[in-house]
Amino acid sequence: VLVSEIDVIDLVPHGRREIIVGDKFTSPADIGYVIFESNSDAVIGYTKFYVEGQYRVAIPAIPDSEINTGDIYILHIASGGDTYPWHTGVSILNTTSLPKTLTIEFDNSETKTVELLANEHKAFTIRSLFGGAAQPGIESGVIKDASGVIGLELFTNNDLNWMGGILLKDDTATNIYYPHTASEDGWKTGIVAYNPSDIDCTIIITPY
């Protein structure tokens, strides 16, 4: 359902426009997602979520050419208890004109179902799928048969004022690149590799 809209935006060559949803749109609390429609195929962007003075994270916007066409992989889930107070939130959008019933298969064999109407957006935490209970035994998952669905996940730790996030994608590859690591001056780098298939695989990690 269309909640709000703003006037036409002109971007000059190499131009950039920042929009704060809460400032530029009416009824911002009712807005679940935004579509930027352009007469050019040379537009890119990103979304930034933040609480001033606490945490922030930036996640790329999704071009219509990269809408998922199959299973979506939830690469990492952090849902701990009081001693590990991480929360994982998932946001998904059905970009199609048909309703969808999505099954989420977790790595501990649990399954949950999420219903999406045509063009519907839903946001939920992993805990909310289990009655609000933390799920420290779940580390990853697969959203099955999710063609036409896009999404992202956010990780938060309120005690540490930490936030992170990634897109939910359907692509896999033989080789994956981690283009930057930092392990000095207090920086730490964590890398994650996830095998969503039912077959074992051998991974060779080569640092350069």
Name the predicted role of every residue range.
Residues 1-208:
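Gly/Pro-rich, tryptophan- and cysteine-flecked surface segments typical
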